Amino acid sequence: MCGIFALLNNYGFFEDEKIKDCFEKGKNRGPEYSEHSKISENFEIGFHRLAINGLNEKSNQPMWIDKICLICNGEIYNFKELFNKIGVKPVTSSDCEIIIHLYKRFGIEYTLSLLDGYFSFIIYDVSCEESQIVYVARDAYGVR
């Protein structure tokens, strides 16, 4: 099971050492790859990868496609069907990539209704210059 990490703080600054310590505590959830990124002055994300699908480096997270960032812990069972349905060729071999494409095309609510699987994810959308959007979601059963 992968580990996802996010920290949003609109009221002050981050103490880098404390943030690093918090992020490192989740490392046992994903020994294959870890990435921590300061996205903006008030938002940081991280990912510890336990690779099951998309076993190449292109499938590492955080995953950025067209100014949309995704970190996801889970498995999307119907990702191939959904790629075919929307006529998009995957950039990576990760089943989670489909979430970005669905979100871009349909928005968050309809995207969630299309996904079959278990997951928790964070989308960070900077495609609109006037604002930045963060969505946090999980599967209906709360498996992740």
Q: What are these language model-derived features?
A:
Residues 1-144:
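N-terminus-centric sequence/structural signature that marks the extreme N-terminus
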